[in-house]
């Protein structure tokens, strides 16, 4: 497994002998499969490709992913081979929502550009038209996806007196919408009316390139796009074109289409705020993610049903 933060290693050590991969770099599926030989379970990170090559290793019973998302794992193949897949939901919701709002505000108010200006000794004094941004307060926030993280972002928006609209294939109950002060709209309305769009959908075949050239063209020229979900949800080439030609005001990104590679156009864009996939990176949250992943795997190793089992069908497959 990759290095885990405490108390993860101690939790696992109580259940099994533990081998830790030393340097934390991303692995290939072949190297993971080789490392998994003789193991009943593995702890994986979101950059690890868990393919059928890995899942067919004899004796492997559980893959514990240290993330909410598990698009790096071939869940269908895992189920076919009777391998349980677990994740770490519910832990990082608030921390990720904090960061989504941080990206939103940094992009809207040009914080990174201002920081670079001062550090580059180009600050010559206050001016009425210097570094003009867009207001967050009383703006319209559009949420693409209103799961746990999306709802956490909506709660924060209330403190800024924002109008919150959302689009999701699984709508909230009317009384929940009323209590949260959010309104469900169609995609066209969300794209055309939002001052800020924050993405909170899982990566699936249907959500890949959910935001492309056509969608970006529908957005306001003063709009800000924020993505803390998964990189391939946004067509980066189309986003680069929209930023370069000022079809939208700015973007705040924590995830990338071909991560860890970043489109050079995003790096060159002065109106992009870029972070290295750190939305959940607070000490408390990451430590708890490691602890939950360890408990998931420890439960499976002991013959139990892990609490965060993604594919319960795997329990019915002889292994």
Kindly give the residue locations of the regions a language model identified.
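Short, well-ordered coil/turn residues at beta-beta hairpins
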Residues: 1, 44-45, 66, 103, ...
């Amino acid at each position: 497994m990759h290095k885990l933060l405490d108390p993860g290693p101690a939790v696992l050590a109580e259940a099994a002998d533990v081998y830790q991969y030393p340097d934390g770099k991303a692995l290939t599926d072949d190297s993971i499969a080789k490392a998994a030989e003789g193991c009943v379970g593995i702890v994986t990170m979101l950059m690890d490709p868990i393919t059928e090559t890995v899942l067919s290793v004899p004796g492997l019973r559980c893959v514990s992913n240290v993330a909410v998302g598990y698009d790096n794992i071939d869940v269908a193949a895992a189920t076919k081979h009777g391998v349980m897949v677990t994740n770490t939901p519910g832990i990082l919701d608030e921390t990720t929502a904090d960061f989504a709002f941080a990206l939103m505000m940094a992009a809207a108010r040009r914080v990174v550009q201002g920081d670079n200006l001062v550090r580059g000794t180009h600050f010559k004094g206050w001016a009425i038209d210097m570094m003009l941004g867009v207001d967050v307060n009383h703006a319209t926030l559009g949420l693409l996806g209103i799961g746990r993280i999306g709802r956490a972002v909506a709660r924060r928006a209330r403190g800024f007196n924002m109008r919150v609209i959302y689009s999701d294939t699984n709508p909230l109950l009317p009384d929940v919408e009323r209590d949260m002060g959010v309104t469900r709209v169609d995609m066209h309305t969300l794209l055309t009316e939002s001052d800020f769009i924050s993405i909170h959908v899982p990566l699936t075949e249907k959500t890949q390139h959910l935001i492309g050239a056509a969608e970006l063209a529908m957005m306001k020229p003063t709009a800000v796009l924020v993505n803390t979900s998964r990189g391939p949800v946004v067509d980066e080439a189309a986003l680069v074109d929209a930023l370069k030609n000022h079809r939208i005001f700015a973007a705040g990104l924590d995830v990338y289409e071909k991560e860890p590679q970043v489109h050079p156009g995003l790096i060159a864009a002065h109106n992009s705020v870029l972070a290295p996939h750190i939305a959940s990176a607070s000490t408390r949250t990451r430590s708890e993610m490691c602890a939950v992943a360890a408990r998931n795997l420890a439960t499976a190793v002991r013959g139990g049903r892990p609490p965060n089992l993604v594919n319960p069908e795997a329990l019915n497959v002889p292994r």
